[in-house]
UniProtKB/Swiss-Prot annotation:
It comes from the Bacteria. PANTHER family: ISOLEUCINE--TRNA LIGASE, CYTOPLASMIC, SOLEUCYL-TRNA SYNTHETASE. Keywords: Aminoacyl-tRNA synthetase, ATP-binding, Cytoplasm, Ligase, Metal-binding, Nucleotide-binding, Protein biosynthesis, Zinc. A motif ('HIGH' region) lies at residues 48-58. Monomer. Its cofactor is Zn(2+). It catalyses: tRNA(Ile) + L-isoleucine + ATP = L-isoleucyl-tRNA(Ile) + AMP + diphosphate. This is Isoleucine--tRNA ligase. InterPro entries: aa-tRNA-synth_Ia, Anticodon_Ile_ABEc, Ile-tRNA-ligase, Ile-tRNA-ligase_type2, M/V/L/I-tRNA-synth_anticd-bd, Rossmann-like_a/b/a_fold, tRNAsynth_Ia_anticodon-bd, Val/Leu/Ile-tRNA-synth_edit. Its EC number is 6.1.1.5. The gene is ileS.
Length: 1044
C-alpha cells in the first residue's frame, strides 16, 4: 500500500518533482475548474514592473498571495488569480533612457517620442519569463497566461472611463502648484511618491542675507538654506507675534532687524551690538525692501518686495525672518494670497536657469549655489554663511535630489472626498490592525490633493482635449467617444498615436490634447475596473466581484497602491476597493541594511530555494516579524533552522509512520473509528479537531501569525509527545487492537495535518499526501476541502490535563538538567506540590506518564512543601518599619530566630505573636521575607503555583538501572551505524565485565526488548567496541544481525 520512505531527503529535488506533477496533471487548472459556479472570492494582485527581477521584497507578499487563495479554494470558493504587469511610467522610461544614452526631455523629443515609446514597449516585459519561473518555483499558483497589462488597449480605455467619471463629478482640476519635481525625469511627482523614495541627510549652505529696507539705511537679516531660490525672491516673511530687535552692529556700523531670540546666535559678545528698538513682527508687515537682483523688479507694482506675516516662521533656527520665492509650497501660497505677481519660474524642464536669470543661465539650480553666494558677497549682501545638515527627499527612481517648483498639473481633489475616504477606511480589515488608525489612517487625515499628471511620454495620456482658441475642454471616456469626435479609428491610446488626433472647434480653433500622461499609480489604482474592461464588458457581473475580498502588499503601499485603490474606489462608488489586507514589512539584510546587489549583502533567493527548499523559505518568512508589517533582518541560517526544526520533524513523523505501517502491512480505512480508548489517542484526536477549529477561525480573519503558531505548537505535540510516547505501541510484535488504534490515529492525524498545512507548505504536503491517500481520494492534496472540526471529538478537559501534565514534566526535566542529572538515570521520588485539587486529581490520573517521563519510581502529591524544604525568615522592613519604630531591630532579630514550625504557622494564614519588652507584635506573612532551604538529597524548583522536588539519593539498584538505559542507547546507536532495519533482530556480545554482568543480571529482559536482541552472549573473541556508559565506566560490546 505505502511506498518506502527514505529518512534523508533533498527537499529542493522533491519540490521540483512536485512541480512537474502539478504541471503534467494540470492540478492548478483542475483546482480552478472544480470550483466554477461556487461562491466567488475576489483577489486583486498588485501589478509589479517587469523591468527588474523579483527579490526578497517580492517573495513575502507572493507567499501570502498564495496561502490565502489556496485556503479559500479548499474552503469551496472560486478564486481567480490573474497576474498583472505595471507597464507604464517612470521606471520603464528611466530604463530606456539609460539604454539609449538619452538625458532629459529635450533629447527624448529629438530622438522621437514614437521611437522612444516603441523601445518602452519592447523592454517592458523583459523579465516576464524569469518572473513566471521564480514565482512558480516559490510554489505560488497564479494564472500568468490570462494576465493583464496596463498598456493593453482595453485597460487604458477603462482608465479613461475612471478619469472621466471623476472629471464629471468635479474631482479633477488643473492648476499651478508647488510640487516635488524630479529634474532627471523632468516631471512632477505626487506627495506619496516622495514618501516611496528616501530622505537623506545632506549638507546645504545656510545663508543669512541682508535685505535693504526701501528708502532707509537699515537691513532685514533673512535666512535661507536654498541659495538658488534667491534670484526669484519676491517677498519676506516674519512671525506676527515674534519679538524682533532693531540693532546697531558696532563693528560694521549698520542697522539690522533680527528675531530677538536669535541675537545670541549671531552675536556671542553683547558688547558688539546695541538694541535700538524692539517690536512684534506685526509692526513690520507691509514694509517694502530693495530686491537683491534686478531680474524681476517689474513685479514690484504687483505687490512684490514687501514683508508679510506667516505662521510657519519660527525662531528655532535662522534669524526669525525668511525669504519668500515661488519654489516653496508655503511661500507660493503667501504670494498667491497677498500679491498679484506673475508665476515666476525661470528654470527649464531639467531645472536649469533660463535667460531670465542672465547671470546664471544654463546652470542646474543646485550647481548655481556657490556662484549666487559669490555674487551676493561681491554686492556686500552676504551677512553670514554656515553649513546646514538636514533631511532632504530624493527621487525614488533616479536617486537624485528633488526640487520643489511651481508647475501646471492635473489634480484629483482629495479635500472634497477626505471624509468619505476616512469612512471607507473604516470598512477595511487591516492586518496588522494598528495600520487602520495609524500609518494609513493618519495619512488619509493629512492627505493633499493628488497630482496625477506627468510631463512624460510612456503612459496613459490624460484624455482631455482643449480648444486652441477658447481653452474649452472636452474630457473623453472611451474610444467610441474619441472616434465620433475625430472621425478616426482608434487602435492605440498611447501619446505618440493620439496626440496626432485633433478636430475643429465650433469656436474657430482646433481641439488639441493636453500634453501630459497619467501617473502610473492612477492606472494601478484603476486595476479593479481596468483589468476587467469595466464598464465596457460584463458590467452586470462587476458588482458581484467588487470590492475585493483580499489583497496583500508591502508597508510602502499604504502610501501607494492601497491609497490609490481607496481614493478611486471611494470617488467612483463611495466604498473601499478591498475588504481585507495583509501588510508585510521590509526584508533587510542580516546587518539591518537595505538589501543591495552592489553591496552583495544577501544571498540570491533562488539559491536559498535550491539549498533549503521553497517550503522552508515560505515558512521562515511567514513566521517572522515581516508578516506583521515589521522589518525582518533576513538570515540564511534562519531558513536552515526552519528546515531543521520544522520541515524535517514533519518528515520524520511521516517516515516513522510509513516504516512501521509497511512492516505491519497496515491498510488505512477512510472510515476510521475515532472514538478511541487510549488516552494518548483521545488526546491527539481532540487536539487536531481543536486545531481545525482554531485554524478555520484565524485564517478566516487573515491572522496568519496565530495560524502558524498553533500549527507549529501542534507539530511539536505530535512529534515530541504523541509519537514519542506511542513508539512502543508500534514496536511490539503482536497486532492487537491497541496497535491498530495507534496506526489509525496517527494516519488520521498526519493526513489531516497535511491538509491543514497545504496552503502554507504546498510541496511537502503534496508529497506526503500522495503516499497516504487511498485509491478513491482526490488526485492532489490541493483538490481537497479544508478540514472542518468534528466538535464532539474535542475534549477540552483532557487537553488541559495533558497540557498541565506536560508543563509539570517540563519543569521537572529542567530541574534535572540544572543539576546535571541525566534523564536516563532513575530517581527514587518526585514530589509535586499544588494546592489546586483539580490539578492534584490530574496528577494522580497521569501518574504513570509522569513517572516514565521523569524516570522516577514513585510520585508524592502534596498540598504544602514541608517534606521538601525548611524555612527561615527575615523581617520585611518595608512593611514593618512604620509599625515598630524603635523596636524594629529587636523584632527583626526575633523573626530570624523563628522555628520552621512557627513559619509554617504563618504560611498557613495564622498570626505569630512576638513579645519584646512587654510589647506584643502580631506577625503575618506580609511582615516576613521567606527563605526556602532544600532538605538533604532533595532538589527543588518553584514555578507559578507548582513546586517540584526530586529525591536525588541514588541506590545501587537505581544506579544499575541508569547504566542499563545508557547501554540500550549505545546499542541503538550501533544499530544505526550498522544500517540495520528497525525490525532486524540481533545478537548482543559483551566481554566478561563485572559491572556489565550486574547490569545484565538485573535487566536482561528489558535490554533484549528495547534492542531487539535475541540473546546476550559473553564473547571476548568478537570485535567489540569500547563505549562509555558514564564518566567512570566503559564497556566492550558488539552486535550482529540474527539471520534466523
Amino acid at each position: 500500500m505505502f511506498k518506502k520512505v527514505e529518512n534523508k531527503v533533498h527537499f529542493p529535488q522533491l519540490e521540483e518533482k512536485i512541480l512537474q506533477f502539478w504541471n503534467d496533471n494540470k492540478i492548478f487548472e483542475k483546482s480552478m475548474k472544480q470550483r466554477e459556479g461556487c461562491e466567488e472570492f475576489t483577489f486583486y494582485d498588485g501589478p509589479p514592473f517587469a523591468t527588474g527581477l523579483p527579490h526578497f521584497g517580492h517573495f513575502v507578499p507572493n507567499t501570502i498571495k498564495d496561502i490565502i487563495p489556496r485556503y479559500q479554494t479548499m474552503k469551496g470558493k472560486h478564486v481567480k488569480r490573474y497576474f498583472g504587469w505595471d507597464t507604464h511610467g517612470l521606471p520603464v522610461e528611466y530604463e530606456v533612457e539609460k539604454s539609449l544614452k538619452l538625458s532629459g526631455r529635450y533629447e527624448i523629443e529629438q530622438y522621437g517620442i514614437d521611437k522612444f515609446n516603441e523601445e518602452c514597449r519592447n523592454i517592458v516585459l523583459r523579465y516576464t519569463k524569469e518572473w513566471k519561473k521564480i514565482i512558480t518555483r516559490l510554489g505560488r499558483w497564479v494564472d500568468f497566461e490570462n494576465n493583464y497589462k496596463t498598456m493593453d488597449l482595453t485597460f487604458m480605455e477603462s482608465v479613461w472611463w475612471v478619469f472621466k467619471t471623476l472629471y464629471n463629478k468635479g474631482l479633477i482640476y488643473e492648476s499651478y502648484y508647488v510640487l516635488p519635481y524630479s529634474p532627471k525625469l523632468a516631471t512632477p511627482l505626487s506627495n506619496f511618491e516622495v514618501n516611496l523614495g528616501e530622505y537623506k541627510e545632506i549638507h546645504d549652505p545656510s545663508l543669512t542675507i541682508k535685505f535693504k529696507i526701501k528708502d532707509k539705511n537699515e537691513y532685514l537679516l533673512a535666512w535661507t538654506t536654498t541659495p538658488w531660490t534667491l534670484p526669484t525672491n519676491l517677498g519676506i516673511a516674519v512671525g506676527k507675534d515674534i519679538d524682533y530687535s532693531k540693532v546697531l552692529d558696532q563693528e560694521k556700523n549698520e542697522i539690522y532687524i533680527i528675531g530677538t531670540k536669535r541675537l545670541n546666535h549671531y552675536y556671542q559678545d553683547e558688547n558688539k551690538y546695541v538694541i535700538i528698538e524692539q517690536f512684534k513682527g506685526e509692526h513690520l508687515k507691509g514694509i517694502e525692501y530693495e530686491p537683491l537682483f534686478d531680474y524681476f523688479v517689474n513685479q514690484r507694482n504687483k505687490g512684490a518686495f514687501k514683508i508679510h506675516t506667516a505662521e510657519y516662521v519660527t525662531t528655532d533656527d535662522g534669524t526669525g525672518i525668511v525669504h519668500i520665492a515661488p519654489f516653496g509650497e508655503e511661500d507660493y501660497q503667501i504670494l498667491k494670497k497677498n500679491t498679484q505677481t506673475d508665476m515666476i519660474t525661470p528654470i527649464d524642464a531639467e531645472c536649469k536657469f533660463t535667460s531670465e536669470v542672465k547671470d546664471f543661465e544654463g546652470l542646474f539650480v543646485k550647481d548655481a549655489d556657490n556662484k549666487i553666494i559669490e555674487k551676493l558677497k561681491s554686492m556686500n549682501l552676504l551677512f553670514k554663511r554656515e553649513n546646514y545638515l538636514h533631511r532632504y527627499p530624493f527621487c525614488y527612481r533616479t536617486n537624485s535630489p528633488l526640487i520643489y517648483r511651481p508647475i501646471s498639473s492635473w489634480f484629483v481633489n482629495i479635500e472634497k472626498i477626505k471624509e468619505k475616504l476616512i469612512r471607507s477606511n473604516e470598512q477595511i480589515n487591516w492586518i496588522p490592525e494598528h495600520l487602520k488608525k495609524g500609518r494609513f489612517g493618519k495619512w488619509l487625515e493629512n492627505a493633499r490633493d493628488w497630482a496625477i499628471s506627468r510631463n512624460r511620454f510612456w503612459g496613459n495620456p490624460i484624455p482631455i482635449w482643449k480648444c486652441s482658441k477658447t481653452g474649452n475642454k472636452i474630457c473623453i471616456g472611451s474610444r467610441e467617444e474619441l472616434e465620433k469626435l475625430s472621425g478616426q479609428k482608434i487602435i492605440d491610446l498611447h501619446k505618440d498615436k493620439i496626440d496626432k488626433i485633433t478636430w475643429p472647434s465650433k469656436y474657430g480653433g482646433t481641439y488639441v490634447r493636453t500634453s501630459e500622461v497619467l501617473d502610473c499609480w492612477f492606472e494601478s489604482g484603476s486595476m479593479p475596473y481596468a483589468s476587467k474592461h469595466y464598464p465596457f464588458k460584463d458590467k452586470d457581473k462587476f458588482q458581484n466581484i467588487f470590492p475585493a475580498d483580499f489583497i496583500a502588499e508591502g508597508l510602502d503601499q499604504t502610501r501607494g497602491w492601497f491609497y490609490t485603490l481607496t481614493i478611486l474606489g471611494t470617488a467612483l462608488f463611495e466604498k473601499t476597493a478591498f475588504k481585507n489586507v495583509i501588510v508585510n514589512g521590509l526584508v533587510l539584510s542580516s546587518d539591518g541594511k537595505k538589501m543591495s546587489k552592489s553591496l552583495k549583502n544577501y544571498t540570491d533567493p533562488i539559491q536559498i530555494i535550491n539549498t533549503f527548499g521553497a517550503d522552508a523559505l515560505r515558512l521562515y518568512l511567514i513566521m517572522s516579524p515581516v508578516i506583521k508589517a515589521d522589518d525582518l533582518k533576513y538570515s540564511d541560517d534562519g531558513v536552515k533552522d526552519v528546515l531543521k526544526n520544522i520541515i524535517i520533524p514533519i518528515w520524520n513523523a511521516y517516515s516513522f509512520f510509513i516504516t512501521y505501517a509497511i512492516i505491519d502491512k497496515f491498510t488505512p480505512n477512510n472510515h476510521v473509528n475515532l472514538y478511541k480508548t487510549n488516552i494518548l489517542d483521545k488526546w491527539i484526536i481532540s487536539e487536531i479537531e481543536s486545531l481545525k477549529q482554531i485554524l478555520n477561525e484565524e485564517i478566516d480573519k487573515y491572522n496568519l501569525t496565530k495560524s502558524i503558531d498553533v500549527l507549529l505548537t501542534f507539530i511539536d505535540k505530535l512529534n515530541n509527545w504523541y509519537i514519542r510516547r506511542s513508539r512502543r505501541r508500534f514496536w511490539k510484535s503482536e497486532n492487537d487492537n491497541d496497535k491498530t488504534d495507534a496506526y489509525e490515529t496517527l494516519y488520521y492525524t498526519l493526513k489531516n495535518l497535511m491538509l491543514m498545512l497545504a496552503p502554507f507548505i504546498p510541496f511537502l504536503t503534496e508529497e506526503i499526501y500522495q503516499n497516504l491517500k487511498t485509491k478513491n481520494e482526490k488526485e492532489s492534496i490541493h483538490l481537497n476541502d479544508y478540514p472542518q472540526s468534528i466538535k464532539e471529538l474535542i475534549n477540552i478537559e483532557l487537553e488541559e490535563k495533558m497540557n498541565f501534565t506536560r508543563k509539570v514534566i517540563t519543569i521537572a526535566r529542567a530541574l534535572r538538567a540544572s543539576h546535571n542529572i541525566k534523564i536516563r538515570k532513575p530517581i527514587k521520588t518526585i514530589y509535586i506540590i499544588t494546592k489546586n485539587h483539580k490539578e492534584q486529581n490530574t496528577l494522580r490520573e497521569m501518574t504513570e506518564i509522569i513517572l516514565e517521563e521523569i524516570n522516577a519510581k514513585e510520585i508524592k502529591i502534596k498540598s504544602n512543601e514541608e517534606e521538601l524544604v525548611t524555612y527561615k525568615a527575615k523581617a520585611n522592613f518595608k512593611e514593618l518599619g512604620s509599625k515598630l519604630g524603635t523596636n524594629m531591630k529587636s523584632v527583626a532579630l526575633a523573626i530570624t530566630k523563628l522555628s520552621n514550625e512557627d513559619i509554617l504557622e504563618i504560611i498557613n494564614g495564622n498570626k505569630h505573636t512576638i513579645t519584646i519588652n512587654n510589647n506584643t507584635y502580631d506577625i503575618t506573612l506580609k511582615d516576613i521575607i521567606l527563605e526556602r532551604h532544600e532538605r538533604k538529597n532533595l532538589k527543588v524548583i518553584n514555578e507559578d503555583s507548582i513546586t517540584i522536588g526530586l529525591d536525588t539519593l541514588i541506590t545501587e539498584e537505581l544506579y544499575l538501572e541508569g547504566l542499563s538505559r545508557e547501554l540500550i542507547r549505545k546499542v541503538q546507536n550501533l544499530r544505526k551505524e550498522s544500517n540495520f532495519n528497525v525490525t532486524d533482530r540481533i545478537i548482543l556480545y559483551t566481554n566478561n565485565d563485572e559491572i556489565l554482568t550486574k547490569i545484565i543480571n538485573n535487566f536482561e529482559n528489558y535490554i533484549k526488548t528495547e534492542t531487539l536482541a535475541i540473546t546476550i552472549e559473553i564473547n571476548n573473541k568478537k570485535a567489540l567496541k569500547t563505549l562509555e556508559l558514564d564518566e567512570e565506566i566503559s564497556v566492550n560490546i558488539g552486535i550482529e544481525k540474527c539471520l534466523n
